[in-house]
Swiss-Prot record:
The keyword Transmembrane helix does not apply. The gene is pyrC. Binds 2 Zn(2+) ions per subunit. This is Dihydroorotase. GO terms for cellular component: cytoplasm. It is an enzyme of class 3 (hydrolase). CDD domains: DHOase_IIa (cd01317). GO terms for molecular function: allantoinase activity; dihydroorotase activity; zinc ion binding.
Length: 447
């Protein structure tokens, strides 16, 4: 449960909540107890239970009410690649997926290494109003791995940047990474590392294993990730600042994270739905929709990641939502760009993998998709308990809604989902952002 007394740095200026009331009826809070009503007034939960008159009403139809989800890792491609995604289409995809806040990575064109770029993204997200879009600043200027971005200016900007990452590239120079951790410590911002020693992955396009060897694909070894994870864990230990590992993908990374946490090192990690559920067996078709960075690994890696998420060794689920146009995916596997869509399938995958199988309950879903991401990013107002006086950032899930994934039906501009044609047994039906309904009956609402 989130500590109500924790004080986090403020965000950029938020769009005002609706000055009216909303009644969410017939929902199971955290999937527990009997169906109840939740009354929202001026963007805040005013009452749980009872009968209330309201300006607007949502019939939850016995669905599960959870805190709105927070995604620490998305690529909304704006500015620079609006042909594949925009803040508007990405926000709509987020709303459909139950997300009330996302963190969009810095590998844009131009790179998100200046306050004016971050502020533009923040303000545009607030004007669209479907999801809080938090810009992630780059660790180094131009993602070149040499000179640090001005963390202080970014953190003090109107976007209030609180996370920095060169995601897509690794900060592989240890001196640069050391300076980044030391600089970040003074202003309590988070450093998120894309763990990849590029000297070990040059020219690689698939997990280094039997399948890649048989198919003639250059292999991407586990050690390329694990060597950076252990280095950065030791740096976090010695220099005392938090470090977050993006998209953990190997069994060895899990072991290293477990060791680091046992030593009290301030390290956190995320895992994607695709690394939890897909393996390199999908390489057989040479379909580039399965190309991703880091690559899909083996079944033993996926199993280790599941166990690590269950026991808290891995803290959160993050989608690494990465839209690409068909020209970047419908080509030779080696030449295709890595990345997969994730915002509109994440909840369904986590429910089918953990809740439907009896491995976890709905509180677990709230923890890994809402509470912990908000805690790690020091994000006020998100990941909060469903309780009176808390912001009404909420998602309703129909746990019995069977649906089939189709990229053509997604709100995202792109269609590169590896789950095309897969049937799921749960779906987000409604999303509420500070009392504003951003998704209704599975449809993103116009701003």
């Amino acid at each position: 449960m989130v500590d109500s007394n924790t004080q986090y740095p403020e965000t950029g200026a938020l769009a005002p909540a609706p000055a009216d009331s909303l009644l969410i009826s017939n929902v199971l809070v955290y999937g527990e107890g009997e169906p109840t009503n939740v009354f929202v007034k001026d963007g805040v939960i005013a009452a749980i239970g009872g009968t209330h008159e309201a300006d607007r009403t949502i019939d939850g139809n016995g669905g599960v009410l959870l805190p709105g989800f927070v995604d620490m890792h998305v690529h909304l491609r704006e500015p620079g690649r609006e042909d594949t995604e925009t803040i508007a289409t990405g926000s709509a995809a987020a709303a459909k997926g139950g997300f009330t806040a996302v963190f969009t990575m810095a590998n844009t064109t131009p790179v998100m290494d200046q306050p004016v770029i971050a502020e533009s993204v923040w303000f545009k997200g607030q004007n669209i109003g479907l999801c809080d879009v938090h810009p992630v600043g780059s660790i180094t200027k131009g993602l070149e791995g040499k000179e640090l971005t001005e963390f202080g200016m970014m953190a003090r900007s109107e976007a209030k940047v609180r996370m920095f990452s060169d995601d897509g590239k690794c900060v592989d120079d240890p001196q640069v990474m050391r300076r980044a951790l030391e600089y970040a410590k003074g202003m309590d911002v988070l450093i998120a590392q894309h763990a990849e020693d590029h000297r070990l992955t040059e020219g690689a396009s698939a997990h280094e294993g039997e399948n890649a060897a048989r198919l003639g694909l250059r292999g991407w070894p586990r050690v390329a990730e694990e060597s950076i994870v252990v280095r950065d864990a030791i740096m976090a230990r010695d220099y005392g600042n938090r470090v977050h590992i993006c998209h953990a993908s190997t069994e060895g990374t899990v072991e290293l994270l477990r060791w680091a946490k046992s030593q009290g090192i301030p390290i956190t990690a995320e895992v994607t739905p695709h690394h939890l559920t897909l393996t390199d067996e999908r390489l057989e078709t040479y379909d580039a929709v399965n190309k991703v960075n880091p690559p899909l690994r083996e079944s033993r890696d996926a199993e280790a990641l599941k166990k690590a998420l269950l026991d808290g060794t891995i803290d959160v689920v993050a989608t690494d939502h990465a839209p690409h146009g068909s020209e970047d995916k419908c080509c030779e596997f080696e030449n295709a760009k890595p990345g997969m869509l994730g915002l509109e399938t994440s909840l369904s995958i986590i429910v089918d993998t953990f809740v439907a199988t009896g491995l976890a309950d709905w509180r677990f879903v709230a923890r890994v998709m809402s509470e912990r991401p908000a805690e790690i990013t020091r994000l006020p107002g998100q990941g909060r308990p469903i309780a009176e006086g808390e912001p009404a950032n909420l998602a309703i899930v129909d746990p019995g809604k069977t649906w089939t994934a189709s990229g053509a039906d997604f709100a995202s501009k792109a269609e590169n989902t590896p789950f095309e044609g897969q049937e799921f047994s749960a779906k987000v039906t409604h999303t509420v952002l500070r009392g504003k309904v951003t998704c209704a009956d599975g449809v993103a609402q116009n701003a």
